[in-house]
Amino acid sequence: MTNVSYDPTRELYKEYNEAFQKHYKEQTGKDIRIVQSHGGSGSQARSVIEGSRADVVTLALSYDVERLQRAGLIDAGWEQELPDDSAPYTSTIVFLVRKGNPKGIRDWNDLTKDGVSVITPDPKSSGGACWNFLAGWSWCLDHFGGNEI
């Protein structure tokens, strides 16, 4: 069995696959070999569309899953599988600061302070970067009601 997924899930699936292998053996009496393939979400989607073997595919962005649907690899309506058209994952955004946190960064609003720079991956090439931007946008909607500041 080949599990194709995006980069940050490597450790999660290593543990999950080991638990699944044990469960499968208990249920069927047979061993199952699971091969992991990890890369950027868009690259993984493209690879599967172009014919790479995949029994299980998990991607970071709904856009990449939609590409699989358009290629005829999954049925329409996949987004309704979970309540509120949600994803089966959560992401935690972490602010890394200099030792001692000299600029007092504690929340999204602190990122607007003079002299604060933000470094994040390019959302065109990183699913995690898209989630970073969406988390910031969500924070703004919650705190400013969609009004510009």
List each language-model region with its residue ranges.
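Ligand-binding pocket segment of bilobal, Venus flytrap-like solute-binding proteins
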Residues: 144-149
